[in-house]
Amino acid sequence: MSGSTAPALSGKGLGAGYGGREVFSQFDFALPQGEVLCLVGHNGAGKSTLLKALFGLHPVSAGEIRLRGQLLKPRPEAMAREGVAYVPEGRGVFPGLVVREIFQLALWSAKLDGAEAEKRTEEVLEVLPRIREFWTRRAGTLSGGQQQMVSVGRALLSRPSILLLDEPSIGLAPKTFQDLMAPIRALQQRLGMSILLVEQNVGEAFAVSDRVAVMKSGRMIFEGVPDDLSDHAKLMDMF
């Protein structure tokens, strides 16, 4: 990344917690433009809280957040308008709706209709063509991998420049995870999208990441390319 290029998304001196319990403090973070950064760590390290704070779903008690170098106070609606999409842990699909309706609802929420809505839908189905196989099925009848694909596809409808993914591999076999991430990685490289991927499944996530950061007890203890982390036996023993 060029020294003159502002990160896609960054935080400086961030603090956040729950019910008086501090999750992280004085935390600095930067997602480079056009890269996939994988943030790894055990449960309770603060990864998901950071993701929620960056998208405006959890308040920060200290520090500042910048989007493409511009200071802002994140709110989900504003972040979405600025091209940031968030896929939460747990998939968040509506079990009673068929997949087509889930997409239609997302398009309606984004005030997209007619030819533009059809165009966006086709774009996503070209990236994730397996969704066509269960397009008319209720989300509650789908497997975990299929639900995750729907959740990611719904996020891609907005053509985000920044994508935040919270543990997309949960409950997925390694091949299913790779089937999900490979086309997303290809799209990211083609469009220059920036992706922050939060994971515990280190090996699978490294295969689709440009950089990796390790979070432990609310602190960043490593950041570099995946091969560099592989050389740190003590850090790898954490996983």
Feature locations, PLM:
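The feature captures the beta-strand-to-loop junction immediately N-terminal to the Walker
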Residues: V40-H42
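Conserved ABC transporter NBD signature motif
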Residues: G63-K73, E82, E116-T121
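Conserved ABC ATPase signature
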Residues: R138-L142
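ABC ATPase C-loop
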Residues: A155-L156
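Helical segment within the ABC ATPase nucleotide-binding domain
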Residues: Q178-L191
